[in-house]
Every structure is written in structure tokens, then in C-alpha cells.
Amino acid sequence: EIQSIFIEHKGNYAYRRIHLELRNRGYLVNHKRVQGLMKVLNLQAKMRQKRKYSSHKGDVGKKAENLIQGQFEGSKTMEQCYTDVTEFAIPASTQKLYLSPVLDGFNSEIIAYNLSTSPNLEQVQTMLEQAFTEKHYENTILHSDQGWQYQHDSYHRFLESKGIQASMSRKGNSQDNGMMESFFGILKSEMFYGYEKTFKSLNQLEQAIVDYIDYYNNKRIKVKLKGLSPVQYRTKSFG
């Protein structure tokens, strides 16, 4: 069963999540026992790599204070949200692909995202409109880095029109946007790094990212969510 879970999740589950998934399936076994069996079976989860893309271009517009201050997890949905942009490059294409998501700090769910060959304002605007569909939000924070898109007047106008507070990381402090950094690290280590040459086109890569986000939201369990996926955790918390 351990080997089956490991293969099903493409080598991305280390012993802690395999232990939780076994528990979800009705198996009562100690996590150290799982760790030992994985060593015997030579099952080792993939290591994450660091990402390199940055949209920071200096002081080009309006900034915001860091309202998060390292307290990443919200106590309810849509209380603390996070956004950023990451870049994908493959040998098969001269163009790059850019992913711009919004993550809910309550359960680490990706509530909206946009994929584009250009990290422009239109991409961010489309993502915002997809994520924040209500007329008004009470006590919602959207945290980002100091990328030029997030300093732009149109970004701040949209947030103000919805009652959303803008929050920004300190310059050069990626850990200030830790939840978003963590998601990008998980995403790339589990479906991109080492697979770059397998993608024959940007369309194929785009579909793989769409499929992965669906898997991440609905199926991939997290230790901090008590062995549930983000959607399962939200559903269980609020019925």
C-alpha cells in the first residue's frame, strides 16, 4: 500500500504524508514504521529547488505595509490571501509561461489563477476578477511582493473598490510571502523540475499546470490540514 501511494503521487509524498494517507484509508500504523519501510523499499521523495523569477523593478508605483508579519494562516476563508508570479521555461519553446495565482491562507487552496506568455497587467487583472467576485469584502488582505504589477495604480484601485487591504513583503524578503513561495516550490518540484524536456509545447505545459492545480486543490493531502486536501479541509470546516 505504501508503494501504491508513492507511485500514485509520483514520488512526491514523503513518509509523513504517506502515513496520513494510510490513516485516511483505514490503516493504523506508526509514522516511524512507515519511514522505516520506505527506506527498505528505497522510496525517497523529491527534493525542492529554489525558484529564480522576480518581477521587482524598483519603486515604480504605490507600495503597502506588510500587514501579515509572518502570521500566514487565516482563521477563516478569504481572510488572508497571497499572490505572486512564477516563470516556466522549456527547451521546446522560445516563449516562457507565467503563472499568476491567488492562494487562500486558510487552507492553502488556489482559488484563482491565470496562465500567460507575458507577465503583464492584464494577467493580474484577470486573476483578480476571477478570485474576488463579491461586491465587497470585509477584513480581507491580499499580500504580494513589491513586483511592478502590484505597485500599479490599477491594482490598488481594484482592491480598494472591493474593500480589500493590500499588503506587501519587504524588499528582497521572499520569506515574507512564505505561503506563495511554498506553493511554487511544491508545484515545480512535483510536476516541472526534471520534466522540462518532456513538454513538447507550451500548450502541453499549460495543461499539465492546470491538471496539477486541480490535483493540488482536491487530492494532494497536507500534514498541516490534518491529512486532508485544501478543498476537503474547507468543506469539512464549513460543511
What role is predicted for each listed range?
Residues 54-58, 144-146, 152-153, 166-188, ...:
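RNase H-like two-metal-ion nuclease catalytic core shared by retroviral integrases
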Residues 2, 18, 34, 38, ...:
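Mobile genetic element proteins and their domesticated derivatives, centered on retroelements
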Residues 95, 113-135:
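Active-site beta-loop-alpha junctions of metal-dependent nucleic acid enzymes
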Residues 70-111, 117-119:
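An active-site-proximal beta-strand-loop segment
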Residues 153, 160-164, 188-239:
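C-terminal domain-tail junction helix/linker
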Residues 107-113, 167-169, 193-195:
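Short small-residue beta-strand/loop micro-motif enriched in glycine and branched aliphatics
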Residues 11, 27, 72-73, 92, ...:
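Conserved, non-catalytic sequence blocks in retroelement Pol enzymes and Pol-derived host proteins
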Residues 1-76, 173, 229-237:
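Basic, flexible linker segments flanking DNA-binding modules
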